[in-house]
Amino acid sequence: CLEHCRNELETLERDIKKLENITLPFPRITYDDAVEILKNNNVDFEYGSDFGATDETIISNQYQKPVMVHRWPAESKAFYMKRDPKNSNLALGVDMIAPEGYGEIVGGGQREDDYKVLINRIKEHNLPIEHFKWYLDLRKFGSVPHSGFGLGIERTVAWISGTKHIRETIPYPRTMYRLEP
């Protein structure tokens, strides 16, 4: 980005030095490590919960670059997230938290590919199985190990460009008084 967009970022008055310090590899910490960071910062956090915006800011401030949080408690992730074969209480999921308080920009993980396990998980989550027929049909006759992720484009653009609010990166943002363009 800096090779191709330095002028644009300077026009936006982005502090380029903060982006120049972003180097690979990104730190990888477990969910438990992240909870420990919160506790060390006197945050009253309920284990098994997802992180809020303030929590993500505290975690990211420890690193000043994107940080990968993995090995989440399984109950905090979606039914389709595969469990860790070494510890079934953990999900094979990951979130990438951007620095400077921009929050989670990527969420992903390995997907459950076993049809029977998926049916049980849907039931465990008290979800109506008929709503997931199409999803189950994709795995009914066999599947392969696979993963997926979601990237928050607007939040990523907000972080890279240094904008104050995510709505500045959305062409037609929804607000309390405007729900359509």
What are these regions (language model features)?
Residues G109, D114-P181:
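Active-site pocket scaffolds in enzymes
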